[in-house]
Amino acid sequence: QRQMCIRDSTKTFAMIADFFDITIPEENKVAVANGESLSLGAHQLTFVFAPMVHWPEVMVTYDAKDKVLFSADGFGKFGALDVEEEWDCEARRYYIGIVGKYGAQVQALLKKAAALDIAIICPLHGPALKDNLAHYINLYDIWSSYRAESEGVMIAYTSVYGHTKAAAQLPVSYTHLRAHETKANL
């Protein structure tokens, strides 16, 4: 009789063996297939592979009863859970730093997720998302397809004496563009 059973992808088990000094007995491992489901009585979990949404072995899990998508690194954000703050800014920073180079893989996951009736998204990092899910999914679609969130032009410059700053601001003075200056202290 087993005391513990780990369900994961074959790739995950291979990575554990390759990178860690851990031996999981074969009788405690159950490799799941993409789309495979597990009944836990009232809850039915479906495993959906999402390779390279940050890591090669990523898998998300969907609970059909409560309509919860456990999204791994997808839809995560930086920040503390006990601080009220807008999700978008820190989620954008998280996406760019952690998941951003895997846009095609995120797009593939979004297509798979579109077939699910999702009420809650629970990422590994950040708060559970319960309201206005279309907003979060739309932002992930924009970010992962490398489209601009809003129209604009960025002129990046550094200026010790102010001359480069004056030159960089010339295009703004001759157009209908509005200037927004952000200073970075390096």
Which residue stretches match the model-derived regions?
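Active-site HxH/HxHxD metal-binding segment of metal-dependent hydrolases
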Residues: 1-38
